[in-house]
Swiss-Prot record:
Pfam families: ydhR. This is Putative monooxygenase YdhR. SUPFAM superfamilies: Dimeric alpha+beta barrel (SSF54909). Keywords: Oxidoreductase. Gene3D superfamilies: 3.30.70.100. May function as monooxygenase and play a role in the metabolism of aromatic compounds. One of its GO terms (cellular component) is cytosol. One of its GO terms (molecular function) is protein homodimerization activity. The keyword Zinc does not apply. The keyword Oxidoreductase applies. InterPro entries: Dimeric_a/b-barrel (IPR011008), YdhR (IPR014910). Homodimer. It is an enzyme of class 1 (oxidoreductase).
Length: 101
């Protein structure tokens, strides 16, 4: 079953195009993660937060990525990562044009 991972954390920038340029190598590497399907990058310069919404093929892959990414962020000085993991209701999501693959 597809699994959604939602996370956010305190982030002081850069934001926007500068963030995209600086984090492009990270974005490209995420594509290689086992079970990874897609990510929507999120940011709020106003609230000094960043994060993302990820879709994985299964919960095991989502949790493995969460563990890896949380450790990476902590090494960069991020003190707290707020994460939630959800099962995806695929029949209802498809009615609303969700891209699940």
């Amino acid at each position: 079953m597809a699994t959604l991972l939602q996370l956010h954390f305190a982030f002081n920038g850069p934001f926007g195009d500068a963030m995209a340029e600086q984090l492009k190598p990270l974005a490209e590497s995420i594509n290689q993660e086992p079970g990874f399907l897609w990510k929507v990058w999120t940011e709020s310069e106003k609230n000094h937060e960043a994060g993302g919404i990820y879709l994985f093929t299964d919960e095991k892959s989502a949790l493995a990525y969460l563990e890896k990414h949380t450790a990476r962020l902590k090494n960069l000085g991020v003190e707290e990562v707020v994460a939630k993991v959800f099962d995806v209701n695929e029949p209802l999501s498809q009615i609303n044009q969700a891209k699940l693959a």
